[in-house]
Each structure stands twice: as structure tokens, then as C-alpha cells.
């Protein structure tokens, strides 16, 4: 007999960008939809797609590239919505480390990565820039990329601008150094992708659960949309409510990460067709997807109008970079008005 319970697995320990999920819980938005949501945290973030794909968990969060790879590896998952759209992702390093904007300056360096796909990405980039995998030392860091850079265990590592880069900036501030000494070689530019969409954070479902419980998923997403609208309308008030529930995030670092995540929150929750096409192509280029792979996403369970995609995604990325730098300097909550 079907119940109203859903198990939901985060992609990491609670972070600033998980705020819509927890507020949907604490503000009763799930309950309004007749749902009982069990929010779970992974022991190992790399296990998320396997746990959802195997049916041990109903739904969860994962980045686009991992969602694609999971289905290709036999774990039946589908993206039903977006949480964080195109956060800038790249190779992070500190000024003075001997690394420059020239990718070949990474030769002989220790480079950290989160999971196996990070290693595949770095290997593909080294090949593109005339290097070999043996020209650098790969270090698997999990979610500790910034920590390892600070401790000197690695020279550089893959991270995202609104999370690990902010962590490096906070470290620099405590050292009396400018935050701008935290640098990033953006992977979208290095790999000529035209977007940072491979790290878009998605709401994903086990396929069998989705097939049997379409209305549950629709109701879940309605609650998430209401919580997202609440966050975007009053981010300061929303944050106060979030840290009341998650006091471990009541610190300057988490608040600054939240400010930097704010512009990336998907207001519509829609999967962006162009982004999926690009990342599916990128996955085939990395040989983690077969040539005939069909993207595993749907917008069928979103019950509000789909927005038009931006006409010039490269210009949108350029404007977002300027916007995020301004946010770093001023510490404000502002959304970017992208060109139509």
C-alpha cells in the first residue's frame, strides 16, 4: 500500500544551499502537501547515486555529471528539477603557489579532486593542454579540497566558487591576505564548454519510485518551489530560520557561502535543456557515457510555466562572473537579471 513517506538523501552534510529542503520541512510545506519527508545525510557523498539508483532511498541531490554517469552505469535515476544552476567550478589555488592562469603551470603539482569524475576531468584537460596524467599527482580529497590546499597537502584542487573558494577566501582574510588571492581556473573555459552546468545540483529520483509515485513527486516539488520562493524573497529571514534548525551553520563562513549561492538558486526548478545537451556531450567526450546515451531528465513533474532559456549563455556567464565578484566584495544578496 502506498504511503506519503519519502526518503531524501542529501549530496553532502547540510550546507547553505540545502536551505530550501530544510525550510520546506520546518515551515510545514511538505506537510501541506500530505508528505512525510525523511532527510538523510550520506556517510560517503560518492554513494548517493548508487543508494538512490538501487532503490534504498527514493530521492536526493546530485550534480548533473554524476546523475548522467549513474544511469550509464546501471543505476536508474532521473533528474526531476534543479536546485543550484551552473555554479562556477574549476581548479582552485592560492596566489604564490607557483600556479598561474596557464594550465601548464600545474605540471609537477599535487591536484585534488572530489571523486573519480574529477580525476577523469583533470586527465582530459591535461591531454588537451599537451600534458600527460603522469605530469601531475592526483589526490582524492572528497569534500576537503579547500582544507587540503590550506594545509599544504595539495597545490590545487577542483571546487566550486560559492563553497570551497569562499572557504579559501576566509582563510586568507584571517592571514591578513586579500581574498582575491584565491584563484580559479574555470573548467568551462578550459574545456571550451560554454557553461558550468556539469556541476548544476539536481533533485533526482529512483526511476521505479518515480514511475509508481508521480503525484508524490509533484507534491514534493510544489513544496520545494514554495520554500525556494521564500528564500529568494527574504534571504536574511530565511537564513535566521535555517540556522535556528541547523545551528552548526551559524558562522561567518556559512553565511558568506549562502550569499554567494543566492544568485545560483534555480527560481523555476526547471532542468535546462541546453545545459543537459552540453553536459551529455561532455560526458561522451570524457568517455563516461556511451555514444548513444540519452539524457536522463524530465520537467514533467513541475506544475508551473517553464521559463525561456537565455538567448546568449556565454554572455550570461560573463555577467554572472561580474555579479559574483561584486557579491564577494560587498557581501550582498542580489539576483542577476539575465538577458532574455
From Swiss-Prot:
GO terms for molecular function: 4-amino-5-hydroxymethyl-2-methylpyrimidine phosphate synthase activity from histidine and PLP; metal ion binding. Pathway: Cofactor biosynthesis; thiamine diphosphate biosynthesis. The modification N6-(pyridoxal phosphate)lysine is found at residue 62. GO terms for biological process: thiamine biosynthetic process; thiamine diphosphate biosynthetic process. Its cofactor is Fe cation. Gene3D superfamilies: Periplasmic binding protein-like II. Keywords: Iron, Metal-binding, Pyridoxal phosphate, Thiamine biosynthesis, Transferase. InterPro entries: NMT1/THI5 (IPR027939), SsuA/THI5 (IPR015168). It catalyses: N(6)-(pyridoxal phosphate)-L-lysyl-[4-amino-5-hydroxymethyl-2-methylpyrimidine phosphate synthase] + L-histidyl-[4-amino-5-hydroxymethyl-2-methylpyrimidine phosphate synthase] + 2 Fe(3+) + 4 H2O = L-lysyl-[4-amino-5-hydroxymethyl-2-methylpyrimidine phosphate synthase] + (2S)-2-amino-5-hydroxy-4-oxopentanoyl-[4-amino-5-hydroxymethyl-2-methylpyrimidine phosphate synthase] + 4-amino-2-methyl-5-(phosphooxymethyl)pyrimidine + 3-oxopropanoate + 2 Fe(2+) + 2 H(+). Pfam families: NMT1 (PF09084). A motif (CCCFC) lies at residues 195-199. Its EC number is 2.-.-.-. Belongs to the NMT1/THI5 family. Homodimer. This is 4-amino-5-hydroxymethyl-2-methylpyrimidine phosphate synthase THI13.
